[in-house]
Amino acid sequence: MSKLHVDIAKACLKEKSKEACGFILGSEVIPLKNISEEPETSFVIDARDYLTYLPDIVYHSHPIGDNGFSEHDLLVASNLRLIFYVYVVEEDRLERFSTETGTTIFQDVLGR
């Protein structure tokens, strides 16, 4: 498993029962505050963070359940034309989506 994938998973685990979110800049994971009114089931990144970092890659987590990308996640990723990752905590699974390559799945990211 790549160091980047492991770093994304570890950043997501720090948020416990809330959806973690942030950006990837180069090989660096940048955790951000989830400003959603319902952070246990959704994530929202402050628009000012997008302007500050100008990211190409966004990550977030699904702390409960075994679902990967939601339809909403894919719609946002497609509209923003960014690469999105979702870490499915209970399954130790990382999914990557881009409009060019579709979805790629990485199992057992942390080997737990």
Model feature map: region roles:
Residues I57-Y59:
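Conserved catalytic cores of phosphodiester-cleaving nucleases, focusing on short active-site segments
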Residues M1-P55, I64-R112:
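Conserved beta-strand-loop surface patch within small alpha/beta domains used
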